[in-house]
Swiss-Prot record:
Subcellular location: Cytoplasm
NCBIfam families with a match to the protein in the record: AA-adenyl-dom, D-ala-DACP-lig, PRK04813.1
Gene name of the record: dltA
Name of protein: D-alanine--D-alanyl carrier protein ligase
Gene Ontology CC: cytoplasm
Keyword set, alphabetical order: ATP-binding, Cytoplasm, Ligase, Nucleotide-binding
Binding site for D-alanine: D197, V301, K492
Cysteine pairs bridged by disulfides in the record: none
Length: 504
């Protein structure tokens, strides 16, 4: 598959087909090609000998998609940066990535960034003045060059830039289109922010098949009336989201085939799909196919998939996450470094062309997590699991990295920032489960000296500081204050004891 050429052919075959819709804004395939070509031409003329990644700032604006393609046509990887990411984190991404340019389809509220900022008005001028000009196709990202870089949580307090190459993305997109039986011209739900790699599961399968991306933003999600009004207008056929989002939608009785009569495929990734959620979806959308998938950001969105049927639900108390895509393979590694036999639990290791080339500017972290096996890149996921008859079962994290509401995070990073807050002497993050999956984060805090009369005021002050350093989804929901943190005999935090205390 020639990814960019496949997207561009729709500008010729169906130029007026809508490529992306967000609220009242939309772009056609013709506009997508013209504006991304114009942008790529401008980037190449401004930075002829430079291939540093480019930050793309915004939320769900159509310009985000134009900017992504403009970057890669000019030979630059893009870094999606959502509006919700705190200024301090944006600053660290800019410094780590070596980016020299930031493209924005909205107002940039972050100050003192070490990059050149191209505003929304600047972009409009570029689209106009460079209209009709085409970039040199030889300059476009290709092969093992980075296509995008997504920053994930890092245990040192610094985000890690996962480098996904053109070949990685082609491997994923080709597999998704074929294995999920995606058809030409379908409407795809775009629910995940672009800085979250779940969004890749809808963006590129939609664009290469001439589909329409129907974006819903965080403000819509916070107002169910607006959300369901948008869904009723959408005629979505391919649903891509975390299971948690679908579970929330299922609380609305009208969320069914009557609301979305042409629903064909549900694609889930990012967290465990509970059996009860899958059963309700089968009841409400009897004609739709439900796919459960698995994969870390470091392996390009997902590498396994399974069609969830009533028979599968009856057979397994906890759903398997699927069979591996044909060009990759899974190894289950025991602690001694040997391969575990069928049915035995160990660390999931992914091998093949979906695997990232590593973390940008972090050779030590890359060496720790990535390796070569039989001449192919391999990623040690840190996830526990086992394989039976080719079917992968996921058993949670081996370390303190978790997925909460679809977002992957390292508890050590949150603890790092929490301990740096005023009024905090010590802290441990305890993830609290509800059934099979994590429900929220609890911060167990040893407070420092303070003058607050009430605990809730202390909590508000700590949360205010955390909001300056971490995304909202990494802020603990509840706080508990103790005089000390329990320790094990070998001097480590006794997390098991803490968990038993807080859940007693």
């Amino acid at each position: 598959m020639k990814l960019l050429e496949q997207i561009e052919k729709w500008a010729i075959e169906t130029p007026d087909q809508t490529a992306f819709v967000w609220r009242d804004a939309k772009i056609t395939y013709k506009q997508l090609k013209e504006d991304s070509d114009a942008l790529a031409h401008w980037i190449s003329s401004e930075y002829p000998d430079d291939r540093s990644p480019i930050m793309v700032y915004g939320h769900m604006q159509p310009e985000m998609i134009i900017n992504f393609l403009g970057c890669v046509k000019a030979g630059h990887a893009y870094i999606p940066v959502d509006l919700s990411i705190p200024a301090d984190r944006v600053q660290r991404i800019a410094e780590n990535s070596g980016a020299k340019l930031l493209l924005s389809g909205t107002e940039v509220t972050v100050t003192d960034l070490p990059v050149r900022i191209v505003s929304e008005d600047n972009l409009k001028d570029i689209f106009f003045t460079h209209k009709g000009k085409t970039p040199n196709p030889e300059h476009a990202v290709k092969g093992d060059e980075n296509f995008y870089i997504i920053y994930t949580s890092g245990s040192t307090g610094n985000p890690k830039g996962v480098q996904i190459t053109y070949n990685c993305l082609v491997s994923f997109t080709k597999w998704a289109v074929e294995d999920f039986n995606l058809q030409t011209g379908q409407v795809f739900l775009n629910q995940a922010p672009f800085s979250f790699d779940l969004s890749v599961m809808d963006i590129y399968p939609s664009l290469v098949t001439g589909g329409t991306l129907w974006a819903i933003d965080k403000d819509m999600i916070a107002r169910p009336k607006d959300l369901f009004a948008s869904l009723e207008q959408s005629d979505i056929q391919v649903w891509t989201s975390t299971p948690s989002f679908a579970e929330m939608c299922l609380m609305e009785a009208s969320f069914s085939e009557s609301m979305l009569p042409n629903m064909k495929t549900f694609l889930f990734c990012g967290e465990v799909l509970p059996n009860e959620v899958a059963r309700k979806l089968i009841e409400r959308f009897p004609k739709a196919t439900i796919m459960n998938t698995y994969g870390p950001t470091e392996a390009t969105v997902a590498v396994t998939g399974i069609h969830v049927t009533e028979e599968v639900l009856d057979q397994y108390k906890s759903l398997p996450v699927g069979y591996c895509k044909s060009d990759c393979r899974l190894l289950i590694m025991k602690e001694d470094g040997t391969i575990a036999p069928d049915g035995e639990k160990g660390e999931i290791v992914i091998v093949g062309p979906s695997v990232s080339v590593g973390y940008l500017g972090s050779p030590e972290l890359t060496e720790k997590a990535f390796t070569m096996i039989d001449g192919e890149r391999a990623y040690k996921t840190g996830d526990a699991g086992y394989v039976e008859n080719g079917l992968l079962f996921y058993n949670g994290r081996l370390d303190f990295q978790i997925k909460l509401h679809g977002y992957r995070m390292e508890l050590e990073e949150i603890e790092h920032h929490l301990r740096a807050c005023s009024y905090v002497e010590g802290a441990v993050i305890v993830p609290i489960k509800k059934g099979e999956k994590y429900d929220y984060l609890l911060a167990v805090v040893v407070p420092g000296e303070h003058s607050f009369e009430k605990e809730f005021k202390l909590t508000s002050a700590i949360k205010k500081e955390l909001n300056e350093r971490l995304p909202n989804y990494m802020i603990p929901r509840k706080f508990m204050y103790q005089s000390s943190i329990p320790m094990t005999p070998n001097g480590k935090v006794d997390r098991k004891k803490l968990l038993s205390e807080v859940t007693a």
